[in-house]
């Protein structure tokens, strides 16, 4: 594979020559073709050009039929330091976002004028921004195989050269911030190619157009000449047959890096003609064109290597200038005139292209001839119009803006260049290398004549012109000689043909004169024949009529047969349509029945799944309810024990306090005898407080007991409610299942009856058996499922009724316990009231018998102690009895709950097992039904096929009998006039013909003519007769 020419990879160069591996920069002259995008030397390569406009080539062309407008970019330079010092006003304003440039005519009391362009860059725009936004896409198109042109256009001193070139020198490996379009495009091209790792080659050319003369800026200078003569080496510009410009003798240099191109640019720019004017200290006095040719190798699908060619033309035009303002004199004035002339021609070309003029004046200037492809051709073009903001240059600025705005409307037709086959280029290069080797060998051996290069090129051009002219004249001479020979031969042929034609005419005149006599005799005999035929025409007419009637009868019979055939075909079609309709209806019925079964089984499966989920949910609800009930029972039991213990402790503490109080009363009776009334009153208050406290405690115990009882009752009520809802749900589910089963049974029976009525005899028998089997199977399945569901419902109702009974008994026991606690509270309250009343009576008696109270203290103490003991014992007995009853109730409830849990788990497991068994039976039934449906479909297909075959067989037999086997008489085609009763023999008829060959021989013998040899004498005689040879005969005919 070829390697990209890179100095760091030159060690990889192999021994054979290769177009991509040139060991050193090469300078050679070529004929550069501008108008069609390729060089003349490339155009000679086996008919393969570099542009896409010449038809098919080895690699094909990539065309774009769509037209593209020329891209116009406007750049406004900032005011110079001198203009700023002079306070020169700015006459234009730039809007980069709106891409508009406004000419401020308001300074002259006129309306402002606005121009819109593809891109607008104001005075603060940087070089990099201009390149990235305007030129970088053009560079990418060049690498895709297009010819592209970028040129700067504007007044002198507006920054065209600065925009195109800028500062060439690099700072380290980076470009300067002021680098222009050309160095940035070169750097981008190398960066993109290196990034793609492409195999490529690159060549550059650099020319100058000064005073309508083209100069090669890269040509080697002749050091033997004076410096003023070195600049006068001009190159000729010619046109080919297509009207394209051809530059002969322009050198192209192979380059390998960007630095080489920079050096060539600096070298060529230094040789350009510049001068100091009043408007620009370094004004370019010529147009320059720097061209980059890029060849990139591509590999096709078939591993064929092609070369993609692209060209980038970077044009720096000289600026138009006002001679009066620039201060040009004599030679400088003539230079400015030539520049303005070429730029004016460019303006006329732009105007003609915009106005779609028939004639575009490309040939009026060499500049427009060079830019012909870029303006209205096949290249992509970008025009950078540069203007000055100074009010002093307003007129030139408006002209530039006007031309740039018009150039926007120019339409090019960009076409990608043809991809040239690598083998063609290699062959061409090998031939050129052989020629160069011969030249080097001749130079080494000093075997030849050495003359200056310019004269040698001129002489070679003249020699070539002469050779071409000589070849053209020789070709013309040969063609003329061949024309003379062909004319002589044609003359002899015509002379011979003329003599033969005269002889033939004489022969025909003689034949015609004899034929007239023969015709007379034929007419007479024809009259005799006509009389005989008229006699026989009556008999022949009668016979023909009879044959016509027979033919009509045969035709009518044949028509009847064809009518019968059409009716038979129609009947067979109707029968076939009927059978097909029945088969289709049966098939649709089977499919709908299959769909109904699928829907039923899917619904049954869904209902089974829902039933399983509901059973699981009921199981969870039951378990949670039982757990909650157990928790509530345990809580109630614990609270009852705690309240009983609290009640015992309260009674014991009360008794203890009473005993202690009596003891204190006895011990201090003597001390408080004086204060007895006060003590009695305090005792009353203490007794009232104690009674109230005991009453509050009793009420609190009663409320807690009521709350526990109400909670238990509510729990049992919830269980009863859940059980009732579960029963309702089971009944509803059972009713839905029964209704669905009944509906399925009814639908199935209706479909079976309809199927039996609609099918044919044979199919009816099969389907009747299938329907009976399916009906029996479905009925059995439905009966089993109904029985199972009823048994499960009964069992579930029994369990739920047991659960309700347990909940009812638990509720009744809780209510009885609550009533018992309430009655006990009432009894305790009454006893407490009685004790309170007794105490009050005692206190009243004590008040009355205060004097005798000491004697009764012992008796009172004994009575109170006995009373406390009795109350404590009764309370302890009641608490113990209550605790035992609660424990027994709790044990019973736990036993019943355990039994119910076991029964409920067994019931739910049985229900789940039954549901799963039902689901399995449904799956088996579904498989059997699908098998039956498939068998029925196959039978229907077989019936349809057999019926179609039988119908076709009947039709073929009918066609055979009516078309091939049916025999009919052939109609008589002979007419009455064709028969002759008195016909002549063949010999007599042949005698009526004119003996033409004998007459010709006789004619020639009488006139002493011997074939064609004596044609000339006959021609001479014939030419002397002034009349036409057929005139007597025609006259006779008249």
Curated annotation (Swiss-Prot):
Instruction: Tell me which InterPro entries the record gives.
Output: KIF11-like, KIF11-like_kin_motor_dom, Kinesin_motor_CS, Kinesin_motor_dom, Kinesin_motor_dom_sf, P-loop_NTPase
Coiled-coil intervals:
453-502
Q: What residue spans carry the Gly residues bias annotation?
A: 49-61
**This protein's UniProt keywords:** ATP-binding, Coiled coil, Cytoplasm, Cytoskeleton, Microtubule, Motor protein, Nucleotide-binding
Give residue spans, biased composition: Basic and acidic residues: 24-34
UniProt KW Hydrolase keyword: no
Q: Name one GO molecular function term.
A: microtubule binding
Entry superkingdom: Eukaryota
Q: Which CDD domains match?
A: KISc_BimC_Eg5 (cd01364)
Q: Where does ATP bind?
A: 154-161
Region (Disordered) residue ranges read 1-63, 1013-1038
Q: Where is the Kinesin motor domain?
A: 69-410
Q: What is its main location?
A: cytoplasm
- Which locations, inside or outside the cell, does it occupy? Cytoplasm, Cytoskeleton; Cytoplasm, Cytoskeleton, Spindle
**Gene Ontology, cellular component aspect:** cytoplasm; mitotic spindle; spindle microtubule
Q: What does this protein do?
A: Responsible for microtubule translocation. May be important for the organization of phragmoplast-specific arrays of microtubules. Plays an essential role in stabilizing the mitotic spindle. Required during mitotic cytokinesis.
Family, per entry: Belongs to the TRAFAC class myosin-kinesin ATPase superfamily. Kinesin family. KIN-5/BimC subfamily.
Q: Which PANTHER family match?
A: KINESIN-LIKE PROTEIN KIF11 (PTHR47970), KINESIN-LIKE PROTEIN KIN-5B (PTHR47970:SF32)
Q: What is this protein called?
A: Kinesin-like protein KIN-5B
Gene name for this UniProt entry: KIN5B
